[in-house]
Amino acid sequence: MKRSDRRILTSHVGSLPRPEALIEINRAKFAGEAYDQKTYAARLSTAVKEICRKQAEIGVDIINDGEFGKTTRGPIDYGAWSSYAWGRLSGWQPGEPGRLPALAGRRDRAIFDEFYRELDATSFISSSAMGGRPPVFVGPIGYVGHQALATDLANFKTALSTVKAEEGFITAVAPGSFARRQNQYYKSDEEFLYALAEALREEYKAIVDADLVLQLDDPGLPDTWDMANPEPSVDEYKKFAMVRVEALNHALRGLPEDRIRYHICWGSWHGPHTTDLPLRNIVDVLLKVRVGAYSIEAGNVRHEHEWKVWRDVKLPDGKVLVPGVVSHATNVVEHPEVVADRILNFARVLGRENVIAGTDCGLGGRIHPQLVWAKLAALVEGAKLATKERVIARRGSSHPATSGEEMP
């Protein structure tokens, strides 16, 4: 995994705006309508090349395929990061009509019920709804996504070879987050988790074997806290989370840690988030995931202050932190100096070589496409400004030294 002691590298979390030509076919797929496979393949390949070109043109260092192989049914979609896996796993069928389990019971929704009624009526769209019939596992889980994954890898590697970028990454859902779906086959939660982990391991290994960085998306690690009713103790929740981390580590066995990064956030919907679990309460569990880098939400008003956690928590030697310094949670485009300040908060505590500037979450499907590119441009410019500051990390100190000289 690329890192630098000469400048602040930049990346993002994954989802980028899909072009209308791709969304048009995605809608047909979701509606069960006929579509031309060759046309879809051509549009997908072209779209991946274009999205890689745009990222490189703006100056993002570590880029991806925009998650274009993960089907969305519209320009706004909060669920494709995980729902894509339904098409790559066996052992499930559509369940009974009803509300998605992932939306039920959130304490934040209970506190702000009037707000959420309006939000649900206007903007919340998830591709995992399966036409109002949430899928349920009813048999042994297997991996059947080999062709779809091979297409994603081939499209991205071809596109990556045509642009100037430091590195490329591909996202995949972690078993803990996907296990929030319904299980009617496995006898225990743990058995269900490990079956998912074993199946998804095929995807993880293929991405690493393709010489790409694997990003594991696991917002469920902190985010499921809000779904637990009644509210558990922090210790109880950490035990619950550790089972998921252990299953993930099982899936990652033998894979090189320095080719894998792990992303958490507190859900990408535009809500109050007053019941989010503080990072301080889960950071020790986070650091038990056997990867080379940790991507965390840190660029919005609910979590921006949590850089201070790292004053007291040691990032393990050789690891990298990828804090979000621009956010999906607001249409306001961050000023590059604000971005630089956020980066420097982390760099002064952890050391600049241990920080890559990122985004809070995937930007595609959360904010308008024009704003996505404006925010990524601000990210790049902010990283340049932060690079000009000489940073001497003093672990445990809240006032490390800086100067205006650029580090050689």
What spans do the regions from the language model cover?
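Domain-level signal for soluble alpha/beta catalytic cores
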Residues: 1-408
